[in-house]
């Protein structure tokens, strides 16, 4: 049985620090994959919005969450990225969080009507829709759903 830490301890540091991309160590057993297309999407997002979501690392710069963001940063030739150090986690908790962080996000869904409204408004604002991560067919379907709702 894995040793547990105090569940109420939370993050023991909320300080975001800039860490050299060259010093970050990908988790060798990371089960999540990142296609070249997705890494380019993440890079586009970083260019448009900035690096808004820090990479989560352990005490030795091992990546716990943010492998795709680091790959995108390397593509953009960024020398440093914002990191949040999670030195309070046990080895088992780090391995589990690598999985949980990716899997739990997949359990969410979309309010398709609200999504269609937001996409329609962004489209009307002439925002670059390619930065949102939806493929062309998805955008067409969702925008036509909004057009249909407006016609009713």
Which role fits each region the language model picked out?
Residues 1-152:
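Aromatic/glycine/proline-enriched transmembrane-helix motif characteristic
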